[in-house]
Swiss-Prot record:
One of its GO terms (biological process) is Cdc42 protein signal transduction. Residues 7-353 form a coiled coil. This is Shootin-1. The modification N-acetylmethionine is found at residue 1. Phosphorylated on Ser-101 and Ser-249 by PAK1 through a CDC42- and RAC1-dependent signaling pathway, which enhances its association with F-actin retrograde flow in filopodia and lamellipodia of axonal growth cones. Phosphorylation on Ser-101 and Ser-249 is increased by netrin-1. The gene is Shtn1. It comes from Mus musculus.
Amino acid sequence: MNSSDEEKQLQLITSLKEQAIGEYEDLRAENQKTKEKCDKIRQERDEAVKKLEEFQKISHMVIEEVNFMQNHLEIEKTCRESAEALATKLNKENKTLKRISMLYMAKLGPDVITEEINIDDDDPATDTDAAAETCVSVQCQKQIKELRDQIVSVQEEKKVLAIELENLKSKLGEVMEEVNKVKQEKAVLNSEVLEQRKVLEKCNRVSMLAVEEYEELQVNLELEKDLRKKAESFAQEMFIEQNKLKRQSHLLLQSSLPDQQLLKALDENAKLIQQLEEERIQHQKKVKELEERLENEALHKEIHNLRQQLELLEDDKRELEQKYQSSEEKARNLKHSVDELQKRVNQSENSVPPPPPPPPPLPPPPPNPIRSLMSMIRKRSHPSGNSAKKEKTTQPETAEEVTDLKRQAVEEMMDRIKKGVHLRPVNQTARPKAKPDSLKGSESAVDELKGILGTLNKSTSSRSLKSLGPENSETELERILRRRKLTAEADSSSPTGILATSESKSMPVLGSVSSVTKSALNKKTLEAEFNNPCPLTPEPGEGPRKLEGCTNPKVTFQPPSKGGYRRKCVGSENQAEPVVVLDPVSTHEPQTKDQAAEKDPTQFEEEGGETQPEYKEDSGGKTGETDSSNC
């Protein structure tokens, strides 16, 4: 079985081998056939290429021959035309000759004419022969050559002209293209010019808007400058008021007044804080409005300028805040100084010995320097109402020196006010007129104050008079230095003088008036005078109101509480030194005379307007004088 299978397989393999060999031979034969066909096709292609090259050569030759023939035809045409032209010329010449000959024949006779006619009949044949002969002649050949040369030259010129014409056409096309380009560029330039005109119009509009906004900004800047000046003047007034508070702090010796003054200072600080907050809110509103305007603008320079203005305003705000902080610190210092002065007053009250009993006879009361000071101020403010109001008190020789001293001090203070020291105007309301009973009762305290000031030390008064003597001839700086030296010498003997001198040096020029009064009213003389008894005696013509059992009164000057200035003389059972208190502008409610009498029956009021009508701030020149009465 295996052998038979193997044989079958071998037979199959052999059969397949034979088939493969046969197929290979067939494929080989086909390959040879294709190669032969390819060779034939290559040969045909080469032959066709050769034929094409031959055809091209032949076509070029034919074209050259055609061109040559065309040229030859043109030459022949020109020759024919020239020959025809010559023939016409010859015919014309022959006709002219015939006419001439006819004339001669007419002269010769008819026989000759017949012969000539016969000759004319034979002329056409002879003409043709002559033409042939002429063409064959040397002249005709020369003319033909010349004509041919002319034809060649004319053809060359024609070619040159054709070339030039083509060049000119090409140049004309280029020129037309350039013209079209120039037209296009011109159109583009016109469009650009129109666009630039539109841009210029827009720029003009924007510049007009910018100029208007710049003018508005200038107006705002001027307003802000005015506000800044007002703020600076307000700060200067606040500084002057603080200096007033410093000067007044030297005379605060009661226990109840420091608390009130601190409350007033706190109220003023609260008002200042409110004003600063309102200004800050207004400033923020303005800044927001300016920012809203600037959001729609593209001008960075204006933004930069506005930012610089904002920085300046912020600097001003910082300065105001610093001044506010300095005012708070000064108020605190005033509080500390008030406490120290209160302690010293308590110590001095404990150390003061009991006063001796008053003597039965009383000298005539000396003049009141404060009243004279007030009368001088009233004379300057109301000169018309000064003639009907006079004082009825006598003036001894000792009192004249004190009045001269006070008068000179008042004149100096008024000179300083006139020279430009601006004081803050005090808001004074209409004050009620003083009643005769209250005036009579208050003049008893004034008489006591006159007695106190009349018995001052002569040495201090003479020294102050010497210092005030050359006032008109000396300069302001020399007077200030002399007063400070006098205050330093006068206050060096008392323990309380050190504080006064230290604070008086820190005050501005207005403090020079208070330094003069301090030099005349030092601590020792006041203690020596207040140790003496000073009962009160009413002036002639006064009411029955008296102060009994009052050994040492306390005189206080209170500011106008919506009713003007008031001066109170408060009698106390305890022995104490006199105190003069100049209180700043208070915010308390006004008290009537009945309410004041209910609170303290021994309290008398003397209004500052007893010898003059009510003060009204009608002009800016009177503000300094009313403030000087506060000092």
